[in-house]
Regions:
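Active-site-adjacent core segments of small-molecule enzymes
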Residues: 1-223
């Protein structure tokens, strides 16, 4: 499977996964008790919204929401979410969206901490605003009116509980590589473990293929 991502990246001359996106500034305010170690209080974050398959123009796609959460010092947690369903079954299914605030963004697979399985999602607070799924429309919209999300977590019972709010605003004008598998808080891992290893390999091959296409070096494990 990794060779597929590498070949696709070489063909596109960019990463195979989430090739088209926009890095923005944001604020994460974690104010509720949570199983996952979100830092309490308000923190500045970097956010990347992207198209998973890189469909042309404003065609629907599985959209991605990556958030770099500061953990203190030089440590951070790169949380990667994709548009998905909201119930106990569909929360594990990536689903395409016709606009940036059209669906919730979920972790799809759970995190494991102290034996607990925990899913994470970001729910748009304004679903009536239809921002076409292309980076240009997103840049204009975020510059004028910030995007607001409620961050929720859920255990095996399928009940969602609000743990934070996320506000996304104008462009950050930074080239950031998110590392959703390698940048995890202490004591937290992706479940199952084999899927985490597979994602590391997929991201590595995606970036290596793009690097071979343009003659640059790739860093393993980044998205």
């Amino acid at each position: 499977m990794s060779s597929v991502f590498s070949a696709l990246a070489r063909l596109r001359r960019t990463r195979a996964l989430h090739p088209d996106g926009l890095v923005l500034r944001g604020t994460l305010d974690a104010d509720g008790p949570a199983v996952l170690p979100l830092p309490r209080g308000e923190h500045e974050v970097l956010v990347r919204l992207s198209k998973g398959a890189g469909t042309p123009g404003s065609l629907p796609d599985v959209l991605g929401l990556a958030v770099r959460v500061p953990l203190g010092g030089d440590r951070h947690w790169d949380v990667l979410l994709s548009t998905s369903g909201g119930n106990r079954v569909s929360r594990m299914t990536p689903l395409p969206s016709t606009h940036w605030e059209g669906r919730c963004y979920g972790s799809v697979v759970p995190f494991r901490r102290d034996g607990d399985l925990v899913w994470l999602r970001a729910v748009p607070q304004r679903r009536t605003r239809r921002i076409p799924p292309n980076p240009g429309a997103l840049a204009t919209a975020a510059r004028n009116i910030p995007l607001h999300f409620t961050v929720e977590e859920s255990g095996r019972d399928g009940e969602w509980r609000a743990v934070a709010t996320l506000v996304v605003r104008g462009e950050a004008h930074e080239d950031v590589r998110f590392e959703p598998v390698l940048s995890l808080p202490p004591g937290v891992e992706m479940s199952p473990r084999w899927l985490g290893r597979a994602r590391v390999e997929a991201y590595r091959e995606s970036r290596a293929g793009a690097a071979r296409a343009d003659g640059t070096a790739a860093r393993p494990g980044a998205s």
